[in-house]
Amino acid sequence: MKLPIYLDYSATTPADPRVAAKMMQYLTQDGTFGNPASRSHRFGWQAEEAVDVARNQIAELVGADPREIVFTSGATEANNLAIKGAASFYREKGRHIVTCATEHKAVLDTCAQLEHEGFSVTYLTPQSDGSLTLRQVESALRDDTVLVTIMHVNNEIGVVQDIASIGELCRARGIIFHVDATQSVGKLPVDLGQLPVDLMSFSAHKIYGPKGIGALYVCRRPHIRLEAQIHGGGHERGMRSGTLPVHQIVGMGEAYRIAKETMADDMTRIGALRRRLWQGINRIEAVSVNGSLEHGAANILNVCFHYVDGESLVMALKDLAVSTGSACTSASMEPSYVLRAIGLSDELAHSSIRFSLGRLTSEEEIDYAIQLLQKSITRLREHSPAWRAFKAGSE
């Protein structure tokens, strides 16, 4: 067993060796290095064919038509293109957007930018487990609502939103529905042939693909239109200009192909490991789950260790790679806005740690993590006046 143990798979994953090997075939002179937009020679034709294969692999995992897949530089850009693109194109229809206070910053900051441009945004406060009810969403809709954007799986607490019901509601009202599926695709079944979703954002590096590449699903039936946010060449059917990075696209396609084959077995095994981790942690006094074990994704466990400062705990757990929030905000000393949105105090939010498990996580690593947590928390609480007061009050 190698130390430190990586338990931060929701931040990023290592590229699968098969993905890396595939990508190398599209980088050097000995490989397929051409520009897929160069249609006058074989180098371009081969590159275009590789892109088409990858586009099909991605579409197959999510039950989409390959023509509905638009490549971007990552899920952040896909979210920007979906939200800004739809809002701009349909602005004459309405200028009201509905989202959730626990969305990723890639969605929240994009919505905030649209507020500066004259749009009105309603930020729904989730229930204590992080979920939204259909009634909450329905009550927020207005005559001028043009877009609803709700993530499928929350990156910090793992709660799974009922995107099927929300999508049906939006479809009935003629409102565009966007889903950030960065944390769900390749981990939960997604069938866009059945789901009433208009736009869906994907990433590669969350499921053992390369960083710097993502995609946006843009529904053809009903036909969804977007205003391009990047101009210069009209690539990707005019929705996203820029030379396609063939090696990254091929890597994403290979990662999605592998995920389609292994997802069911992976998540059964990872779910068992998460239960094992929680059973061990739950033997520690004064701990609680943030979110829901029952309605959460199998790979994420967010735990509050009462009477322990989270930053001190992370430092004490130098042999564990874990986080106190999302990777995009982990440098901030502010408590997690997601945990505050579900009702935790700043103190409890600061005392919380996210564990996210992956394809390479082993039972041995989980057992080591449990032992280290038990020892570290006992040691840290020995120096905690709040813990001593709690113990004195409970005796």
Swiss-Prot record:
Record note on quaternary structure: Homodimer. Forms a heterotetramer with IscU, interacts with other sulfur acceptors.
Binding site for pyridoxal 5'-phosphate: A75, T76, N155, Q183, S203, A204, H205, T243
GO BP terms: [2Fe-2S] cluster assembly
Residues that, per the record, bind [2Fe-2S] cluster: C328
Native species: Erwinia tasmaniensis (strain DSM 17950 / CFBP 7177 / CIP 109463 / NCPPB 4357 / Et1/99)
Gene that this sequence comes from: iscS
Recorded catalytic activity of this chain's protein: (sulfur carrier)-H + L-cysteine = (sulfur carrier)-SH + L-alanine
One Pfam family of this chain: Aminotran_5
Residues annotated as the enzyme's active site: C328 (cysteine persulfide intermediate)
Residues found modified as N6-(pyridoxal phosphate)lysine: K206
Protein name: Cysteine desulfurase IscS
